[in-house]
Design a protein with these regions (language model features):
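N-terminal nucleic-acid-engaging modules of covalent nucleotidyltransferase systems
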Residues: 1-139
Length: 139
């Protein structure tokens, strides 16, 4: 079964120990998973979006679209400072962001909405856990 990024993080958050959570993240490693953790926890990342969540229409949970975030995560660069998209007008950026989150699995969309405000929806997936799982991220 193809797991979405939010699903992997939710599963890890339910595990009892830090070591189990770290191992689960390593076992389900994917560039998009690492990038989610990096964009959430790295102090140099600044999102170029308002703090409030935009109005959007979430997809149906029944749709099998957990892979969309994994395959389209490169689009997130458009919403972060210093990633070659700083000159995009704010209104255009916000419109592109709405289109992006509307294309995602509803759980992955909620995850992106949280990390843009530097918050992880699962308290057990801390910066410490991310750092132990993926020390190369420089967290």
């Amino acid at each position: 079964m193809n797991k979405g990024i939010a699903e992997i993080l939710a599963e890890a958050s339910k595990m009892e120990t830090v070591e189990e959570r770290v191992e689960h993240l390593k076992k389900n490693d994917h560039p998009s998973l690492q990038t989610v953790l990096y964009y959430c926890y790295h102090p140099s990342i600044t999102w170029l979006l308002p703090d409030t969540n935009p109005p959007y229409k979430p997809r149906l949970k029944e749709e099998d679209i957990q892979n969309v975030l994994k395959s389209d995560f490169r689009k997130v660069r458009m919403f972060v400072e210093g990633k070659d998209y700083d000159n995009v007008k704010p209104i255009k950026r916000e419109m592109l962001f709405i289109e992006f989150i509307e294309s995602l699995d509803p759980d992955d969309a909620k995850l992106i909405l949280s990390i843009k405000n530097k918050k992880m929806p699962w308290k057990n997936i801390s910066r410490h856990v991310a750092k132990k799982a993926f020390p190369g991220l420089g967290l």
